Every structure is written in C-alpha cells, then in structure tokens.
C-alpha cells in the first residue's frame, strides 16, 4: 500500500507529484531543489549554499515519514555544472559521512527555477 508523505517543512511540490511516497519500508523522496519552504524562494548563490538547503529539505521529508539521513540507500544528484562536483562533495560528505549511500551524479543542461542542483533519494528502514 502506498502512503503519501507531506510536510510544511519542505517546499510544496511545483507540479503533480508528492514530496515523498512510502511503500512498505521504502521511502521515495522526490527531487528537492534549494527552495526555502517558508518563503518559496530559491536560496543560495553558490553550490555549497544550495546543497545545504537541498539536503535540509530532504531531511524534512525523511523525518516526516519517520526516517533519517542514515536510512538513505541511494541518491540521484543533478548538477547544472559538473565543475561544481568537488565543492558539492565537500558539503554532501558532511551529511553522509557514516556509511554513505550509493549515488549517481550527472550534469544536466537546466533545472527547475534555474537552480544549480537537485537531489532525489530512496531510503529504507533497516
């Protein structure tokens, strides 16, 4: 059975999708961009600031479903410029230092609202 996850602590969806969907013990978190959930404005002028906001948004959806970052088993990262890869990794590694999840990182030509990064994750309860 599918359970829809929603929290005011993450940005409202900007299209016909859910912030998260839980099926059994697996949680699928939709792509998060660096939008402040209180103002609905893009935050951060650089990849470091935007990465922090994105991961904080992901944490909010995870926590709304009773999960934590340690439960993330896979992440998909979309960067507007692959030259930001190293700087992105420096921030990402602070959140996923203990048993980091599997990950795919790709460069894309454009992201919603012209942000620098979008991340989606899959989490599973142990």
Swiss-Prot record:
Alphabetized Gene3D superfamilies for the sequence:
RutC-like (3.30.1330.40)
CDD domains given in the database record: YjgF_YER057c_UK114_family (cd00448)
Q: Which family does it belong to?
A: Belongs to the RutC family.
Question: Which species does this protein come from?
Answer: Saccharolobus solfataricus (strain ATCC 35092 / DSM 1617 / JCM 11322 / P2)
Question: Among the entry's GO cellular component annotations, what is one?
Answer: cytosol
- The protein depicted here goes by the name RutC family protein SSO3206
Organism superkingdom = Archaea
**InterPro entries named in the record:** RidA (IPR006056), RidA_CS (IPR019897), RutC-like_sf (IPR035959), YjgF/YER057c/UK114 (IPR006175)
